Design a protein with these regions (language model features):
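C-terminal helical "tail/cap" subdomain of flavin- and related membrane-associated enzymes
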Residues: 310-391
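N-terminal glycine-rich dinucleotide-binding loop that anchors FAD/FMN and/or NAD(P) in oxidoreductases
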Residues: 45-69
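Conserved N-terminal helical subregion
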Residues: 2, 55-59, 70-169, 178-182
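Conserved FAD-binding catalytic core of PHBH/FMO-like flavoproteins
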Residues: 152, 159-253, 262
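Glycine-rich FAD pyrophosphate-binding loop
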Residues: 10, 24-45
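Beta1/beta-strand and adjacent pyrophosphate-binding region of the FAD-binding site
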Residues: 1-13
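N-terminal Rossmann-fold NAD(P) dinucleotide-binding loop
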Residues: 16-17
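FAD/FMN-dependent oxidoreductases across multiple families
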Residues: 231-316, 323-326
Length: 391
């Protein structure tokens, strides 16, 4: 039944390609629409994959990504409100030496691997056209392209924040639209060879600083800095930045030799819904965008894709077509509350470390030290980070 049905995925970034690849096994015809495929899709970021996310991707045929990822065995949290300290306040680790807390992979590597697989599939089509309009037909969504060609689809998936204008007719509702008044600066440190299997989060007074281990000689940095912070001076000059990291973190990296290009991103907490969700779904940052403090953004997107697969299998077993009202409702019921609760939890963690009161900071630091001794609570945190929240 499915081989006569069509899905349109709008957006050819990592989210769009991942959806297309994971849905390709359903014998659906899938069009990936992008206005400009020639535009370079270079993403400088490294992605944190939970063990659960990576295991699922491997199960769907992306087995090579495990070899191309760097394993995380430890996660250290440092409350550095008063000053930068390398002594951790909270430590997460794996009990089994063969296991991992998470994995770090280059987003371009993952993108290239999925793209190559898609190019070899006969039910995947890349359309390099601009969309003029999207309208309802009796049993389809009708997409009209700028060249006036029309195509009907059982389901339309928005997978790129570049297509917000097309969503206006679907009555996009911003459930949450909050600015953190800070920017994330993303870059890589190239350093001497070390045993690099620990991720670290330093909660500085003006924003969190995260280290993600990429290889024995490379570490990815995500530094969130308040708009009015004095720390902006460091990221504006590589010479100052290199000196800053060598002064404060030499014990971790021996010597930092160089720093890559610095990329800047505005940080927001966004949670969107469609009032008119007939045969239409959203994935990725166009649906929900969270603070990178816990490295959970991409895992959240993957969990949503896996939920869609589960719902499609359910509809297939009942003989229902893709995009029907039951599928849309069941998917939204499975994901919306979980996503909102999880995103709110991440936002709450950011708030906890955003309070600039000395007495509060003292209590917070003591609380982290006490949590470090509670293995039950720590294991629950690890499980939530690995598999998400399911309510």
């Amino acid at each position: 039944m499915f081989n006569s049905q069509k899905i349109c995925i709008i957006g050819s970034g990592l989210t769009g390609l991942t959806i297309a690849y994971l849905l390709s096994r359903f014998r659906l015809k899938i069009d990936i629409v992008e206005q400009d495929f020639n535009k370079k899709k270079i993403n400088p970021t490294k992605i944190a994959l939970s063990k659960s996310s990576l295991d699922e991707l491997c199960r769907y045929g992306l087995k090579d990504i495990k070899k191309k990822s760097n394993i995380i065995k430890n996660i250290y949290l440092h409350d550095s409100y008063s000053s930068i300290s390398l002594k951790q306040d909270l430590h997460f680790s794996v009990s089994n030496k063969k296991e991992a807390l998470a994995y770090i992979i280059d987003s371009n590597t993952l993108f290239s691997d999925i793209y190559k697989k898609l190019k070899s599939l006969k039910n995947i089509y890349f359309i390099n056209k601009e969309i003029s309009s999207i309208n309802d037909e009796k049993f389809f969504k009708e997409i009209t392209f700028k060249d006036l060609i029309k195509k009907n689809y059982n389901l339309v998936i928005f997978a790129s924040a570049n297509n917000l204008s097309l969503l206006s007719r679907f009555k996009l509702r911003k459930v949450v639209d909050k600015s953190y008044n800070e920017d994330a600066y993303v870059f890589n440190l190239f350093h001497e060879k070390i045993l690099n299997n620990s991720a670290r989060q330093f909660f500085l007074k003006d924003g969190p600083l995260a280290f993600l281990p990429v290889s024995s000689t490379e570490t990815s940095v995500i530094w969130s800095i308040k708009n009015n912070s004095i720390n902006k001076k460091y990221v504006s000059n590589k010479k100052y930045l290199l000196k800053f990291f060598n002064n404060h973190f030499q014990e971790l990296f021996k010597e930092i030799i160089s720093i890559s290009e610095i990329n800047k991103f505005r940080l927001n907490y966004i949670f969107n819904e469609l009032k008119d969700s007939k045969r239409t779904l959203m994935f990725g940052e166009i649906a929900n965008k969270i603070h990178p403090i816990a490295g959970q953004g991409w895992n959240m997107t993957l969990r949503n894709i896996f939920s869609l697969i589960k719902v499609i299998k359910y509809c297939e077993n009942l003989g229902l077509e893709i995009g029907n009202d039951i599928l849309i409702k069941k998917y939204l019921d499975e994901t919306n509350l979980n996503n909102f609760t999880f995103a709110t939890l991440i936002d709450s963690i950011r708030k906890i470390f955003d309070v600039k009161i000395d007495s509060y900071a003292y209590i917070r630091k003591n609380t982290l030290s006490n949590l470090d001794k509670n293995f039950f609570i720590k294991n629950n945190f690890v499980n939530i980070a690995n598999k998400g929240l399911f309510i």
